[in-house]
Design a protein with these regions (language model features):
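Short beta-strand-to-coil "C-cap" segments at the C-terminal boundary of structured domains/repeats
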Residues: 106-110
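Acetyl-CoA-dependent GNAT
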Residues: 1-39
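Hydrophobic adenine-recognition pocket in adenosine-nucleotide-binding enzymes
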Residues: 48-50, 83
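A conserved beta-turn-beta hairpin within the catalytic core of GNAT-like acetyltransferases
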Residues: 35-45, 102
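Conserved active-site alpha-helix within GNAT-family acetyltransferase domains
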Residues: 61, 85-103
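Conserved acetyl-CoA-binding loop-helix of GNAT-fold acetyltransferases
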Residues: 50, 56-69, 96
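Conserved GNAT acetyl-CoA-binding A-motif
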Residues: 71-83
Length: 110
């Protein structure tokens, strides 16, 4: 059997940053990916981060909402988010945006 490799240029990324007084208060990344199964891209939400001084002020929610808006604007047919934590409160946080636990992620650090 022979294996062929095809280089695909079908990935792009958008960093959404919340800025307060010229400083980054929080961020989230949206990666847009295309595969051969769908005409539209899908979104991958990663690295939602809020500086400690801005915790419990709704900034994380605003960042996720901005990512969802951008994913829709980019024509994504779905949005996937992952987390290193499986805390119940984190599942609740994402569920309020319609992001529900779906399957299992497998990972190998390289």
């Amino acid at each position: 059997m022979e294996f062929k490799k095809e280089k695909k240029d079908n990935v792009s990324g958008i960093k959404i940053v919340a800025v307060e007084n010229g400083q980054e208060a929080g961020r989230a990344f949206l990666y847009l990916l295309k595969n051969d199964l769908h005409q539209e891209p899908f979104g991958f939400l990663e690295d939602v981060f809020v500086e400690a001084e801005y915790h419990k002020q709704g900034l994380g929610s605003q960042l996720v909402e901005k990512v969802i808006e951008e994913a829709k604007a980019q024509g994504c047919y779905k949005l996937i988010a992952t987390s290193r934590s499986s805390k119940p409160e984190l599942e609740k946080f994402y569920a309020k945006f319609g992001l529900n636990v779906w399957g299992v992620e497998f990972r190998k650090d390289l």
